[in-house]
Amino acid sequence: MARLLTNAASARVARMPVRELAARISSMRDALDSETARRDFEVLQSHVNGARRFDIVGVAISTGGPNALGRFVPLLPASFPAPILVVQHIIPGFLDGIVKRLNDSCEVAVRMAENGQQLEPGAVYFAPDKKHLTIARTPQKKIISKLSDKPEGLLFCPSADVMFKSMAAVAGSRCLGVIMTGMGHDGVE
């Protein structure tokens, strides 16, 4: 019976005009992307608002990043209780536009990270092109950003591995790492 239903569905798709099929596939992909972004946000929110409080959140994103971020970041309230760092693998020169577009359409402040900048809750900080983004604590226990081109020789700069290792060293169990999209192994070490 299942095979008959599959064959019937295949026959309907085969007779469907290409434009209509493309439009249906596109709308299903958009619905799936929106649902995925909503679920990702709910998981993140449950972790951040749960019994455990995070001092810092890091997001690694690559292929499909601008679209995923465009669905995810607008869901964050201005009252989000931790700063969020983002490493986006993208062709140099495109990141400024993404940051501006997100900042203009979100409740949270979205900006490019600067060296030595105090990281504030309710703000998203992107690693600039060709700079690793790490964090440090000041003597007053504030978290600040550090930008560097070291270590050299990595496939990706900025590197999610470098960011996540820094977060773990500084915040320990009070950090949360999120890998949203991509390819390769950056961020899984």
In which residue ranges do the predicted regions lie?
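Conserved acid/base catalytic micro-environments in cytosolic active-site loops
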Residues: 1-189
